[in-house]
């Protein structure tokens, strides 16, 4: 967010499935804000601002009319035009809405939430590409993502059709931790890019990866992988305040350079 403020013409941020205050409550972000700002007026005000920002973040970016970037994936419930028509500001949370919206196909409420729009956003933020070995009943190309409890699994054939419909070359998404920081699916048409190294801590290490795109390169895309380095002797246990201080001072220094 700091970089986006410093250079708004160069930094673009998609919404992911964790940009949802209900999810943030379970994964520690709300607790972190409370620890830093306490439950006073400033802390509550900051939470409200962040909650609003999450709902305003774009869901998809298209790069050079060739590459779609989305957090989770795609489904047979939406194309890019229908996605634009959704008032995403209404959906500050997807996981905290009442069952009247989430379980009733005709569900809607007085605030403007509809089951249709909710299910589209869930598919956009919670879906995964199906492995080639996955079987789909009948002529279906998308099916319920039962392991996650939200979104869909979509087939290789659906990837081809969706990209062809939008005249795009490939889809870049994240949402799944990868040992090498990235993984290709569906004959290279889908790339999972996961930039957080050692996501699960010392129990399960993984590389992070970024993709550098440039029309001047040959090939135009270059993957860079990396891993967090730890000091000799293992992990240094830090309290929340100490950890935040180390990370945020470094981040702020970089933002100040941009400013």
Please give the residue ranges for each predicted region:
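Feature recognizes metal-dependent phosphohydrolase scaffolds
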Residues: 1-259
């Amino acid at each position: 967010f700091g970089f986006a403020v410093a250079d708004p013409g160069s930094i673009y941020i998609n919404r992911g499935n964790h940009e949802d205050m209900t999810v943030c409550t379970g994964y520690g972000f709300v607790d972190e804000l409370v620890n830093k700002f306490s439950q006073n007026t400033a802390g509550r005000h900051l939470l409200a601002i962040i909650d609003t920002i999450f709902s305003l973040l774009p869901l998809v970016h298209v790069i050079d009319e060739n590459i779609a970037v989305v957090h989770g994936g795609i489904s047979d419930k939406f194309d890019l035009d229908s996605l634009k028509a959704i008032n995403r500001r209404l959906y500050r949370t997807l996981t905290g809405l009442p069952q009247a919206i989430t379980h009733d196909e005709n569900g809607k409420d007085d605030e403007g939430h509809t089951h249709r729009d909710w299910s589209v956003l869930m598919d956009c933020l919670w879906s995964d590409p199906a492995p080639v070995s996955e079987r789909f009943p009948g002529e279906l190309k998308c099916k319920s993502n039962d392991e996650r409890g939200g979104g869909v699994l979509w087939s290789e054939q659906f990837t081809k059709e969706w990209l062809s419909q939008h005249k795009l070359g490939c889809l870049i998404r994240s949402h799944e931790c990868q040992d090498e920081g990235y993984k290709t699916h569906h004959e290279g048409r889908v790339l999972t890019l996961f930039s957080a190294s050692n996501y699960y801590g010392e129990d399960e290490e993984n590389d992070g990866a970024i993709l550098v795109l440039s029309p001047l390169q040959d090939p135009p895309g270059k993957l860079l992988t990396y891993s967090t380095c730890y000091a000799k002797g293992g992990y240094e246990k830090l309290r929340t305040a100490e950890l935040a201080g180390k990370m945020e001072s470094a981040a702020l220094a970089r933002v100040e350079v941009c400013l």
